[in-house]
């Protein structure tokens, strides 16, 4: 059975990591000196936090990296018992081989409960001589200040377009698939700097066709073309509510798009609309209100239809 491409092409060391040059440079410095503080990696999903932690461990420990590295996903194991058992049991034992310390990687650590984070803080203090913690999170504000103050903080930004394109082209060549420019542009659009999403979309598209264009990508990603979203929005802004709503229903039924997906794509199109700055402000406010109501459980079609209606009377 073929491995997912995100695993098949995951970097094996820090030299292979795509993007984040400054962060990688600092991590290599830790490897060279065999010394590092506790680390906190923050950033949106798919930008390389887990990969950086794994590559750091492999470069630090070589063949014994699995014995000296513990990875836990805090969103699955988020309670205080995990800190008291798995984490503490691993932290209290000495490193294997000539490693100066062990590394515990807590992925999605912002999902840990407050009690678990306080227990973690005490564990970090107690075993700091033989163990280092690498915490990964999407929202650093959810990490308690005492933990943040004990860590060197690394902020991972969404990957640049050139980094995404370079990596996707290398994978395409190895898998003998042809990605047209329109297909590559579509992958960049739907992934929004998320390498994991970009590779997954590429693999899904390759399962449909060995010649990948924008039609294939938007279909497998369940996203509308930007020009279709723009067309719907402009119809609504010009007071053609019925036509705009028909376009909306087409997107939701034919493309299987969720209300949340459509809201995000409308929001991304706002800067490109030929309306005044004041109208853009009012439109963003209406989009925010619609998004809030959908998240709270309101009917998606009704809320999006109401948003299209408001567009026709923007001031």
Curated annotation (Swiss-Prot):
<dbReference type="InterPro" id="IPR003959">
    <property type="entry name" value="ATPase_AAA_core"/>
</dbReference>
<feature type="binding site">
    <location>
        <begin position="43"/>
        <end position="50"/>
    </location>
    <ligand>
        <name>ATP</name>
    </ligand>
</feature>
<dbReference type="Pfam" id="PF00004">
    <property type="entry name" value="AAA"/>
</dbReference>
<dbReference type="Pfam" id="PF21960">
    <property type="entry name" value="RCF1-5-like_lid"/>
</dbReference>
<dbReference type="GO" id="GO:0005524">
    <property type="term" value="F:ATP binding"/>
</dbReference>
<comment type="function">
    <text>Part of the RFC clamp loader complex which loads the PCNA sliding clamp onto DNA.</text>
</comment>
<keyword id="KW-0067">ATP-binding</keyword>
<keyword id="KW-0235">DNA replication</keyword>
<dbReference type="InterPro" id="IPR047854">
    <property type="entry name" value="RFC_lid"/>
</dbReference>
<keyword id="KW-0547">Nucleotide-binding</keyword>
<comment type="subunit">
    <text>Heteromultimer composed of small subunits (RfcS) and large subunits (RfcL).</text>
</comment>
<dbReference type="InterPro" id="IPR008921">
    <property type="entry name" value="DNA_pol3_clamp-load_cplx_C"/>
</dbReference>
<dbReference type="InterPro" id="IPR013748">
    <property type="entry name" value="Rep_factorC_C"/>
</dbReference>
<dbReference type="GO" id="GO:0006261">
    <property type="term" value="P:DNA-templated DNA replication"/>
</dbReference>
<dbReference type="GO" id="GO:0016887">
    <property type="term" value="F:ATP hydrolysis activity"/>
</dbReference>
<dbReference type="GO" id="GO:0003689">
    <property type="term" value="F:DNA clamp loader activity"/>
</dbReference>
<dbReference type="InterPro" id="IPR023748">
    <property type="entry name" value="Rep_factor-C_ssu_arc"/>
</dbReference>
<dbReference type="InterPro" id="IPR003593">
    <property type="entry name" value="AAA+_ATPase"/>
</dbReference>
<dbReference type="GO" id="GO:0006281">
    <property type="term" value="P:DNA repair"/>
</dbReference>
<dbReference type="InterPro" id="IPR050238">
    <property type="entry name" value="DNA_Rep/Repair_Clamp_Loader"/>
</dbReference>
<dbReference type="InterPro" id="IPR027417">
    <property type="entry name" value="P-loop_NTPase"/>
</dbReference>
<comment type="similarity">
    <text>Belongs to the activator 1 small subunits family. RfcS subfamily.</text>
</comment>
<dbReference type="Pfam" id="PF08542">
    <property type="entry name" value="Rep_fac_C"/>
</dbReference>
<dbReference type="GO" id="GO:0005663">
    <property type="term" value="C:DNA replication factor C complex"/>
</dbReference>
<protein>
    <recommendedName>
        <fullName>Replication factor C small subunit</fullName>
    </recommendedName>
</protein>
<dbReference type="GO" id="GO:0003677">
    <property type="term" value="F:DNA binding"/>
</dbReference>
